[in-house]
Amino acid sequence: MTTSSPTATTAQAHGRFIRGSVSKVRRVLDQIRGRTYRDALIMLEFMPYRSTGPITKVLRSAVANAEHNLGLDPASLIISQATADMGPSMKRYRPRAQGRAYAIKKQTCHISIAVAAQTDS
């Protein structure tokens, strides 16, 4: 498997240890991958999912990195990569009847978003 290295016109941002299931975050990232920054923000604002808050925060950070570090215009940016990887689970216990305890796993994930300058081809 080959991995693509970020190019000179790509800026990245990572959100680590975000509370939420990786599958629930991925269903939102699948919707915004490949879209422009403006379209993605509008979509995230009106989606009814709890994970849109942290995703919006990471997306804004990636765009700020592109503006500050690379001098790119936010209007010309597209979301080139958007991934969610599994983080560690926090283990908690729920007391149950007759002295039993049920395990509860509170899942976390790592969100990575890369934005690139839009090419006119």
From Swiss-Prot:
Keyword check for RNA-binding: yes
Keywords carried by this UniProt record: Ribonucleoprotein, Ribosomal protein, RNA-binding, rRNA-binding
Complex formation: Part of the 50S ribosomal subunit.
HAMAP family: Ribosomal_uL22_B
Name of the protein in its database record: Large ribosomal subunit protein uL22
Underlying gene: rplV
Signal peptide: none
Gene Ontology biological process terms, A to Z: translation
InterPro entries, per database record: Ribosomal_uL22, Ribosomal_uL22_bac/chlpt-type, Ribosomal_uL22_bac/org-type, Ribosomal_uL22_CS, Ribosomal_uL22_sf
One GO CC term on file: cytosolic large ribosomal subunit
Similarity field: Belongs to the universal ribosomal protein uL22 family.
Job description of the protein: This protein binds specifically to 23S rRNA; its binding is stimulated by other ribosomal proteins, e.g. L4, L17, and L20. It is important during the early stages of 50S assembly. It makes multiple contacts with different domains of the 23S rRNA in the assembled 50S subunit and ribosome.
Molecular function GO labels: rRNA binding; structural constituent of ribosome
Alphabetical list of SUPFAM superfamilies matching this protein: Ribosomal protein L22 (SSF54843)
PROSITE patterns (UniProt xref): RIBOSOMAL_L22 (PS00464)
